[in-house]
């Protein structure tokens, strides 16, 4: 659809495609993960060495503002993936969330094949991919034209604290 839009229209089109967005109003699986992080339970992410792209809501807003003010020849007809340049592992994300909540990481290492088998048996194979799989977006097209992402740690902390309140 994006390719068709880029070729069929006479207006200048810029496509911004954010990866998983995190922030104070996180929903669905991300919100559930925040709630789980706010328990004393040890979590099975000690061996989760995956790499996943995330982007904070703040960085999405900043990137969109940047794209709307960029010179036309730099952005027109292009697709920009919005993702912070450094992917995070689930282990790192959970550790940052627990730190923001004043909790120790309490991560146990469960081999990936065991987690995959367990989640597949309970009909949650997609959840395994989301928690243990890799998904890295190429952000070079946006950073090449001068956009600078803010570090996401403050937004991770805000998301964790907001989930605690709700």
Residue ranges and their predicted role:
Residues 20:
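PG/GG-rich flexible active-site loop of Rossmann-like NAD(P)H-dependent oxidoreductases
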Residues 26-32, 46-69, 77-78:
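Substrate-positioning beta->alpha
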Residues 106, 126-166:
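C-terminal amphipathic/interface module of NAD(P)-dependent oxidoreductases
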């Amino acid at each position: 659809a994006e390719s068709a839009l880029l070729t069929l229209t006479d207006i200048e089109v810029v496509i911004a495609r954010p990866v998983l967005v995190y922030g104070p109003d996180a929903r669905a699986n991300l919100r559930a993960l925040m709630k789980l992080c706010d328990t004393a339970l040890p979590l099975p992410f000690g061996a989760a060495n995956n790499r996943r792209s995330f982007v904070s809501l703040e960085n999405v807003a900043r990137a969109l503002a940047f794209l709307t003010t960029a010179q036309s020849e730099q952005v027109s007809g292009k697709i920009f993936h919005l993702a912070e340049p450094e992917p995070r592992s689930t282990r790192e994300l959970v550790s940052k969330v627990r730190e923001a909540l004043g909790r120790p990481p309490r991560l146990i290492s469960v081999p990936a094949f065991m987690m995959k088998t367990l989640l597949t048996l309970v009909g949650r194979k997609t959840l395994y991919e989301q928690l243990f799989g890799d998904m890295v977006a190429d952000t070079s097209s946006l950073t090449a034209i001068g956009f600078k992402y803010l570090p996401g740690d403050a937004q991770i902390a805000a998301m964790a604290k907001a989930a605690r309140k709700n």
